Amino acid sequence: MEGSALIGRRTLTLGTALAALTLGACGGTAQDAKEPSGTFEVSVVESKFPQKQHISQAEQLVIAVKNTGNKTVPDLAVTVDSFAAKSEQPELADPSRAVWVVDTSPAGGDTAYVNTWALGPLKAGKTRRFVWKVTAVKPGTHTVKWRVAAGLNGKAQARSGGDQVPQGQFTVDVSDKPSQSRVDPATGEIVRSN
């Protein structure tokens, strides 16, 4: 009996030590450890999204950003906060409801963040375009807010025109009537009429 109690204590001590080692290995370096600190000058040279849309109609949202500074932007990113809206129904497990469905997002820009896309470093004088193809699924008037960042973790700050955060918004009216479309027999292209 005494021997099995001793084995039990050793097993418990060994298990505790292994658990401590395992938890200690989870830490690692901070997520933003490799992101440089600083301010990076950029300019939004294009931002467009149709003001009048129809439900079930695919449209493009475009934001193009130029590095107007003299140093490389570490990881050019754009956050779009308004592809979904909060439902007022109190008993929903997830109150987020789509306003637009993202059909395609900027190529190679997916991140771990739900509403942020990053296209990597941007050298001085260069421009990068973020293009989303989205389809409206909720009629009404909606505001789409966006902002540009120089990195994903907050240490690299994008600025435009001095100390301004490069950001903007679109006000969009989505009609509850789907747009009419047909196939042009001569070209095979889809022709939409509103």
Regions found by a protein language model. Name each.
Residues 80-115, 123:
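A surface/secretory-pathway sequence property marking extracellular, secreted
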Residues 63, 135, 141-168:
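Serine/threonine-enriched low-complexity regions used as flexible
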